[in-house]
Amino acid sequence: MSFKGFKKGVLRAPQTMRQKFNMGEITQDAVYLDAERRFKEIEMETKKLSEESKKYFNAVNGMLDEQIDFAKAVAEIYKPISGRLSDPSATVPEDNPQGIEASESYQAVVKDLKDTLKPDLELIEKRIVEPAQELLKIIQAIRKMSVKRDHKQLDLDRHKRNLSKYESKKERTVKDEEKMFSAQAEVEIAQQEYDYYNDLLKNELPVLFQMQSDFIKPLFVSFYYMQLNIFYTLYTRMEELKIPYFDLSTDIVEAYTAKKGNIEEQTDAIGITHFKVGHAKSKLEATKRRHAAMNSPPPTGASSIASTGTGGELPAYSPGGYNQPYGDSKYQPPSSPATYQSPVVAATAQSPATYQSPVATGQPPSYLPQTPASAPPPQVGSGLPTCTALYDYTAQAQGDLTFPAGAVIEIIQRTEDANGWWTGKYNGQTGVFPGNYVQL
């Protein structure tokens, strides 16, 4: 916008606000308002015709191109992967030669169909799209003329308001008289300009309306029959699709189910698919389970102590423990059994109190019914259900349980879903782990 246009816009701004809020005197022409309404309808119809014809032209071309690309993708899926493209025997179909042949035949049919529809699509572009674009250019020029007419109306109302302000004064000075005469001259000029553009549009718009009835309506009719011809061609060519691989006589869902077979069961039997399903659970649910496992007390309560005492792995408590020397400790290290210890160590750390010598203890031996030393207790002896790890698992987040393949894990809490997150204990550590990594 030039500086002159910006200046005019500032001068017209107050009158524009008054016109929007219907304040003061506003110049109106009922004949022009009706013509303006019809002109807007023509403008909208022409834009719609241009946009819809473009969309249809691009949609048909895009649909055919996508069908060709789809057939190419299916053929690539059926073809085996080969690292030597120069070897002719490397590209021999090994999996589904019928599927490759069907995809190539379908690709050829679609290419032929695209060549058949090419003249019809070009006819749409020449007979519909291009004429609609030319009509839009004419409408845009008329719209500029209508905007100029609206600006002249604002100027006329603005000058009339200025003139009425001086005329309403009861006592006018000489300076007011000069301004009033100047305002009268401006009103006359603005009235002439407004009448020129207003009469021009009122005389020319009916001609456009007559041309519209002779131009736009036939375009819609032509567009309809062109679409009908394209749909008929698509229907007839697809109905004549003679590819033995496709059974077009049966229901499409039944044919798909028959060709699919038991592929879902075979896929579920692969271990890697269960791995993906297990880790595809909601992160929020996994986080809740980790926090629940971290906040729950460890399973080393009275039940585990009782089971340890009854199992016989550790010696019983001796009443004279405070007076016994260091060598009389009843603790058995789980790393090595008593049968492989030296005589000195066996006499001091592993042997019962009955066999302690007076020299070593400094007091008479006490008879305590203790079980002889045995092998170290197994990792799992708390009475909880256990499971065996099928794979190695490394903790992915805080609260996870790490274990190697073959490890025996105590199950503290489990879900009904084998792919869920279970809570267990291994090697003194408590945490959560995926249930599909273990076997009961």
Curated annotation (Swiss-Prot):
<dbReference type="GO" id="GO:0043332">
    <property type="term" value="C:mating projection tip"/>
</dbReference>
<dbReference type="Pfam" id="PF00018">
    <property type="entry name" value="SH3_1"/>
</dbReference>
<dbReference type="GO" id="GO:0110085">
    <property type="term" value="C:mitotic actomyosin contractile ring"/>
</dbReference>
<feature type="domain" description="SH3">
    <location>
        <begin position="382"/>
        <end position="440"/>
    </location>
</feature>
<dbReference type="GO" id="GO:0030479">
    <property type="term" value="C:actin cortical patch"/>
</dbReference>
<dbReference type="GO" id="GO:0036180">
    <property type="term" value="P:filamentous growth of a population of unicellular organisms in response to biotic stimulus"/>
</dbReference>
<dbReference type="GO" id="GO:0015629">
    <property type="term" value="C:actin cytoskeleton"/>
</dbReference>
<keyword id="KW-0843">Virulence</keyword>
<dbReference type="GO" id="GO:0006897">
    <property type="term" value="P:endocytosis"/>
</dbReference>
<dbReference type="InterPro" id="IPR001452">
    <property type="entry name" value="SH3_domain"/>
</dbReference>
<dbReference type="GO" id="GO:1903475">
    <property type="term" value="P:mitotic actomyosin contractile ring assembly"/>
</dbReference>
<dbReference type="GO" id="GO:0005516">
    <property type="term" value="F:calmodulin binding"/>
</dbReference>
<feature type="region of interest" description="Disordered">
    <location>
        <begin position="286"/>
        <end position="380"/>
    </location>
</feature>
<dbReference type="GO" id="GO:0030100">
    <property type="term" value="P:regulation of endocytosis"/>
</dbReference>
<keyword id="KW-0206">Cytoskeleton</keyword>
<dbReference type="GO" id="GO:0031505">
    <property type="term" value="P:fungal-type cell wall organization"/>
</dbReference>
<dbReference type="Pfam" id="PF03114">
    <property type="entry name" value="BAR"/>
</dbReference>
<keyword id="KW-0963">Cytoplasm</keyword>
<dbReference type="GO" id="GO:1990528">
    <property type="term" value="C:Rvs161p-Rvs167p complex"/>
</dbReference>
<dbReference type="GO" id="GO:0042803">
    <property type="term" value="F:protein homodimerization activity"/>
</dbReference>
<dbReference type="InterPro" id="IPR004148">
    <property type="entry name" value="BAR_dom"/>
</dbReference>
<comment type="function">
    <text>Component of a cytoskeletal structure that is required for the formation of endocytic vesicles at the plasma membrane level. Plays an important role in virulence.</text>
</comment>
<feature type="domain" description="BAR">
    <location>
        <begin position="17"/>
        <end position="254"/>
    </location>
</feature>
<keyword id="KW-0254">Endocytosis</keyword>
<dbReference type="GO" id="GO:0031097">
    <property type="term" value="C:medial cortex"/>
</dbReference>
<dbReference type="GO" id="GO:0060988">
    <property type="term" value="P:lipid tube assembly"/>
</dbReference>
<dbReference type="GO" id="GO:0097320">
    <property type="term" value="P:plasma membrane tubulation"/>
</dbReference>
<dbReference type="InterPro" id="IPR046982">
    <property type="entry name" value="BIN3/RVS161-like"/>
</dbReference>
<dbReference type="GO" id="GO:0051666">
    <property type="term" value="P:actin cortical patch localization"/>
</dbReference>
<feature type="compositionally biased region" description="Polar residues">
    <location>
        <begin position="337"/>
        <end position="373"/>
    </location>
</feature>
<dbReference type="InterPro" id="IPR036028">
    <property type="entry name" value="SH3-like_dom_sf"/>
</dbReference>
<protein>
    <recommendedName>
        <fullName>Regulator of cytoskeleton and endocytosis RVS167</fullName>
    </recommendedName>
</protein>
<dbReference type="GO" id="GO:0005934">
    <property type="term" value="C:cellular bud tip"/>
</dbReference>
<dbReference type="InterPro" id="IPR027267">
    <property type="entry name" value="AH/BAR_dom_sf"/>
</dbReference>
<dbReference type="GO" id="GO:0008092">
    <property type="term" value="F:cytoskeletal protein binding"/>
</dbReference>
<dbReference type="GO" id="GO:0008289">
    <property type="term" value="F:lipid binding"/>
</dbReference>
<keyword id="KW-0728">SH3 domain</keyword>
<dbReference type="GO" id="GO:0030448">
    <property type="term" value="P:hyphal growth"/>
</dbReference>
<dbReference type="GO" id="GO:0072741">
    <property type="term" value="P:protein localization to cell division site"/>
</dbReference>
<dbReference type="GO" id="GO:0007163">
    <property type="term" value="P:establishment or maintenance of cell polarity"/>
</dbReference>
